[in-house]
From Swiss-Prot:
<dbReference type="GO" id="GO:0005737">
    <property type="term" value="C:cytoplasm"/>
</dbReference>
<dbReference type="GO" id="GO:0004869">
    <property type="term" value="F:cysteine-type endopeptidase inhibitor activity"/>
</dbReference>
<dbReference type="GO" id="GO:0005615">
    <property type="term" value="C:extracellular space"/>
</dbReference>
<keyword id="KW-0964">Secreted</keyword>
<dbReference type="InterPro" id="IPR018073">
    <property type="entry name" value="Prot_inh_cystat_CS"/>
</dbReference>
<feature type="modified residue" description="Phosphoserine">
    <location>
        <position position="103"/>
    </location>
</feature>
<feature type="signal peptide">
    <location>
        <begin position="1"/>
        <end position="23"/>
    </location>
</feature>
<keyword id="KW-0646">Protease inhibitor</keyword>
<protein>
    <recommendedName>
        <fullName>Cystatin</fullName>
    </recommendedName>
</protein>
<dbReference type="InterPro" id="IPR000010">
    <property type="entry name" value="Cystatin_dom"/>
</dbReference>
<feature type="disulfide bond">
    <location>
        <begin position="94"/>
        <end position="104"/>
    </location>
</feature>
<dbReference type="GO" id="GO:0031982">
    <property type="term" value="C:vesicle"/>
</dbReference>
<comment type="similarity">
    <text>Belongs to the cystatin family.</text>
</comment>
<feature type="disulfide bond">
    <location>
        <begin position="118"/>
        <end position="138"/>
    </location>
</feature>
<dbReference type="InterPro" id="IPR046350">
    <property type="entry name" value="Cystatin_sf"/>
</dbReference>
<keyword id="KW-0597">Phosphoprotein</keyword>
<keyword id="KW-1015">Disulfide bond</keyword>
Length: 139
């Protein structure tokens, strides 16, 4: 009888330990903390387009740049939505006056090709139709 009771206590302790370990995974993500966002997310795409328009507007380059690839993208719910983006951008063959950058090819001549990694932080309040570039750092 004592052996059976010991097994039940041991089994209950093991189940509690497994529950605590599995439950801690859900608790590690804090409310309001940045979370990964899918690259195809509509809000992310708007934020990225806005960040690139601001980057090109501030750039002294004769040519426009556009995103080569998204390295990482996170979304944080604050009093709006903050997008934290790390992207690789490249110089295109299109002058700044061009409208549609997606159809612009990247320079392939070594002296003209320029690739840079940038971090953009974009703050969006979609229900007020407001968007602002909070941070733009490129290396």
């Amino acid at each position: 009888m004592a052996g059976a009771r010991g097994c039940v206590v041991l089994l209950a302790a093991a189940l509690m330990l497994v529950g605590a370990v599995l439950g801690s995974e859900d608790r590690s993500r804090l409310l309001g903390a940045p979370v990964p966002v899918d690259e195809n997310d509509e809000g992310l795409q708007r934020a990225l387009q806005f960040a690139m328009a601001e980057y090109n507007r501030a750039s002294n380059d004769k040519y426009s740049s556009r995103v080569v690839r998204v390295i990482s993208a996170k979304r944080q719910l604050v009093s709006g939505i903050k997008y934290i983006l790390q992207v690789e951008i490249g110089r295109t063959t299109c002058p700044k006056s061009s409208g549609d950058l997606q159809s612009c090819e990247f320079h392939d001549e070594p002296e003209m090709a320029k690739y840079t990694t940038c971090t953009f932080v974009v703050y969006s309040i979609p229900w007020l139709n407001q968007i602002k570039l909070l941070e733009s750092k490129c290396q």
